[in-house]
Swiss-Prot record:
Pathway: Alkaloid biosynthesis. Belongs to the cytochrome P450 family. This is Geissoschizine oxidase. The gene is GO. One of its GO terms (biological process) is alkaloid biosynthetic process. Its main location: membrane. Heme binds at residue 441. It is found in: Membrane. Its EC number is 1.14.19.80. Pfam families: p450. It comes from the Eukaryota. The chain crosses the membrane at residues 7-27. GO terms for molecular function: heme binding; iron ion binding; monooxygenase activity; oxidoreductase activity, acting on paired donors, with incorporation or reduction of molecular oxygen. The lineage of its organism: Eukaryota, Viridiplantae, Streptophyta, Embryophyta, Tracheophyta. It is a single-pass membrane protein.
Length: 503
């Protein structure tokens, strides 16, 4: 999530005196607590101005470099704490998992994500626990990922054939990768091809780009006039209507299928959710509404964008490090020698490629600031008091670049994971790009499988060059931050077919 600040509006300065009157009663209690250290807080705005000019994970890293691995901030009306060490991240995400299991509410989560529905934004409680169970046992279970492998392979072959048709020309991989990921998701979701998939992709991209998830309005929640003055809620309402129409069509089409069209083994993701809505699922102790279903479906689409971003970062780093690229490519070509397509059943042979993915996730996590938590009660972290209601960020980008944890932390070196058990499953606090604890991302296996398939196909079937004689060290690695961290400028590469594929 990104913080976006704009103080140029005259309305903001007009409201300053009223904001001060609202905030003043909160100051006395905080002064008696042992809060973490942090920068000086200015009246009303707190530390908001100090966040301008840098991407949020970099701005917060700069603060924790000065004040220590736990840092207290005042962001408008909100109390916030940032932790930037593996040890403190473990305290927040694991040791005190229940205390920090809630999410803060934002305009984006309220308006676009169906009043904080879906697993990502839901408040911690019975509804969240039900969704977590549904994800684990049905939607993204190991069984479903395995059953999707044949279709993944088929879509991967189509993906490769399309790239083959453009051999010798610079191409942007990211759009083709998204098309593959959405085709796989729709097959898992409805058992077939979706009408106009590009409309869903564009809607997800637009929401991601607009998910500067905490804006000025979010930092002053008591000032209900701010959203109207900024006009951002109008933008969100228009986007919500577009998303709503798309998802209503998807659900309606699925409901029209004949009752005997699918057997138990052919039940797809949307079928599972519709069954729960109708009260016939074994977990249906809490009513599931159409809005809940739409929130879950759309958050799965948004997750595809994170997988696509990780694939692009991994290719970028391998192109910048030719020795790593060759080592990974040699391994893939040995594993699939003599075959004309990539098979999911052989992915277990790719030990080095798995290290490449770990290293890409260490250096370029999908969400450099893990989705924020909200303290449900007062709690002590690192010897400091975190008051109830405080928003807590784990700056995983800082953990992934911590020189006390990683030798040559800014160097892309997959070998650092050789002969270690460190994995991104949430049990090793030094590598938590998907989070940890009760709110860990439920789609780790699904995402990792798609990443391995995509990178294997790109390395196996093609050699790759940079366009116009660009040198590896000249590759632009600038970031853009929306709902996650992506390349600011898409990676352009020139494919050369080596091992043709037939779809």
């Amino acid at each position: 999530m990104q913080m976006e600040f704009s103080f140029s509006s005259p309305s903001f300065f007009f409201l300053l005196p009223f904001l001060f009157l609202l905030i003043k009663p909160l100051i006395s209690r905080k002064s008696s607590l042992k809060l973490p250290p942090g920068p000086k807080k200015f009246p009303i705005v707190g530390n908001l101005f100090q966040m301008e000019g840098l991407l949020p994970h970099l701005a917060l890293k700069k603060m924790t470099d000065k004040y220590g691995p736990i840092c207290h901030l005042k962001l408008g009306e909100l109390e916030a704490v940032v932790v930037s060490s593996a040890e403190l991240a473990k305290e927040v995400l694991n040791t005190h998992a229940v205390t920090f299991a809630d999410r803060p509410v934002t305009n984006v989560s309220k308006i676009v994500m169906y009043n904080n529905s879906g697993m990502t934004f839901a408040r911690y409680g019975d509804y969240f626990k039900l969704l977590r169970q549904i994800y684990a046992s049905e939607l993204l279970s190991p069984k479903r990922v395995r059953s999707s492998s044949n279709h993944m392979e088929d879509e991967l072959s189509k993906f490769v054939v399309k790239i083959q048709a453009e051999t010798g020309k610079p191409i942007f991989l990211h759009d083709r990768v998204k098309s593959y990921l959405f085709a796989v998701l729709f097959d898992s979701m409805i058992g077939g091809v979706c009408k106009c998939p590009e409309r869903y992709i564009e809607a997800a991209k637009e929401l991601s780009a607009n998910s500067a998830a905490m804006r000025l309005e979010d930092f002053f929640p008591s000032v209900t006039l701010l959203p109207k003055l900024s006009g951002f809620n109008t933008v969100l309402a228009k986007l919500k209507k577009e998303i709503d129409d798309l998802l209503d069509d998807l659900i309606s089409e699925r409901e029209k299928r004949p009752a005997n069209a699918t057997g138990p083994m052919e039940e797809h993701m949307l079928d599972v959710l519709l069954k729960l809505r109708n009260g016939s699922g074994s977990e249906a102790k809490i009513p599931i509404t159409n809005e809940d279903i739409k929130a879950v479906v759309f958050e799965l689409m948004l997750a595809n964008l994170s997988t696509a971003a990780t694939e692009e970062w991994a290719m970028s780093e391998m192109m910048r490090n030719p020795k790593v690229f060759k080592k990974a490519q040699d391994e893939v070509r040995r594993a699939f020698k003599g075959k004309n397509r990539i098979c999911a059943s052989e992915l277990h042979k790719l030990e080095y490629l798995k290290l490449v993915i770990k290293e890409a996730l260490r250096m370029h996590p999908p969400a450099p600031l893990l989705f924020p938590r909200k303290a449900r009660e007062d709690c002590e972290i690192g010897g400091y008091t975190i008051p109830a209601g405080t928003m807590v960020w784990v700056n995983y980008w800082a953990v992934g670049r911590d020189p006390q944890l990683w030798h040559d932390a800014d160097k892309f070196e997959p070998e650092r994971f050789s002969d270690t058990s460190i994995d991104f499953n949430g049990s090793h606090s030094e590598l938590i790009p998907f989070g940890a604890g009760r709110r860990i991302c439920p789609g780790i296996l699904y995402s990792a499988t798609n990443l391995e398939l995509l990178l294997s196909a790109l390395l196996y079937h093609f050699d790759w060059e940079l366009p116009s004689g660009e040198k590896p060290e000249e590759i632009d690695m600038d970031e853009f931050y929306g709902s996650g961290c992506i390349r600011k400028n898409p990676l352009a590469l020139v494919p050369k077919v080596v091992i043709p594929c037939q779809a």
